[in-house]
């Protein structure tokens, strides 16, 4: 009798252990730890922070000032250590010199090879109506405006100011210039996938990025190439769009 009791006792114990193990396997997995990711972005003119009061010099020494310098960055993608991609969906940055801190989203803790993004907007976003976005959204109606109502699209880069147009290039910055660069064909991929960083548990991560206006204006002659609405001077708009990826670096 005792042997039978022992046998049934052991059998019940084994069944209980199997059931417990099954419950453990069915338990919800522990979610991966995440931390907040943000970008600290400087818009510089060479080694000087861009602003709307300073007189700057371009690569040839020609003087210019800025009264507007805003641009869109979007479609951010993190490159994981194994080469796979982590898109940061629904994030659009409207960058201007006065605002340097841009909060992105929570991302998994781990090692990353770098980041990719677009200068400008993808075609779907580019052709949405800014009136549908709430005030404060980067895609909402802005003042001054950064959307072409007549062209149904956003201005990816809006740079305006005054420049010296003397032949010798030794005068004062008093002639208006404007570069309004947009249209689907002029979005450009920015590849910073060779800039590794790590997101550590318990510490929010901030990426330090710099855009150099002098690189955006590389090989642009302010005296003779001082205006484009894109459609009316596509070669100049294309030159500026082509320059943009090389203007942005991670510090």
Located regions from the model:
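Bacterial N-terminal signal peptides that target proteins for export
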Residues: 2-10
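N-terminal, intrinsically disordered, basic low-complexity segments enriched in Arg/Pro/Ser/Thr
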Residues: 12-15
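C-terminal motif of bacterial Sec signal peptides marking the signal peptidase cleavage site
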Residues: 18-22
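A short, solvent-exposed, low-complexity linear motif enriched for acidic/polar residues
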Residues: 24-251
């Amino acid at each position: 009798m005792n042997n039978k009791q022992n046998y049934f006792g052991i059998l019940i114990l084994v069944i209980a252990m199997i059931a417990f193990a099954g419950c453990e396997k069915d338990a919800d997995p522990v979610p991966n730890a995440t931390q907040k990711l943000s970008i600290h972005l400087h818009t510089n003119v060479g080694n000087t922070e861009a602003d709307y009061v300073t007189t700057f010099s371009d690569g040839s020494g020609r003087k210019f000032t800025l009264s507007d310098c805003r641009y869109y960055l979007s479609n951010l993608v993190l490159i994981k250590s194994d080469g796979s991609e982590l898109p940061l969906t629904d994030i659009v940055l409207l960058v201007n010199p006065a605002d340097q801190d841009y909060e992105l989203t929570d991302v998994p803790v781990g090692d990353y090879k770098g980041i990719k993004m677009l200068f400008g907007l993808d075609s779907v976003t580019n052709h949405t109506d800014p009136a549908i976005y709430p005030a404060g959204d980067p895609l909402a109606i802005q003042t001054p405006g950064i959307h072409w109502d007549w062209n149904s699209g956003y201005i990816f880069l809006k740079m305006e100011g005054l420049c010296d147009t003397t032949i010798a290039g030794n005068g004062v910055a008093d002639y208006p210039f404007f570069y309004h660069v947009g249209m689907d064909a002029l979005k450009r991929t920015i590849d910073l996938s060779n800039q590794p960083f790590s997101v550590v548990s318990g510490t929010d991560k901030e990426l330090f990025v710099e855009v150099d206006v002098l690189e955006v204006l590389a090989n642009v002659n302010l005296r003779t190439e001082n205006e484009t609405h894109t459609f009316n001077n596509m070669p100049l708009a294309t030159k500026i769009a082509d320059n943009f990826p090389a203007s942005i670096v991670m510090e």
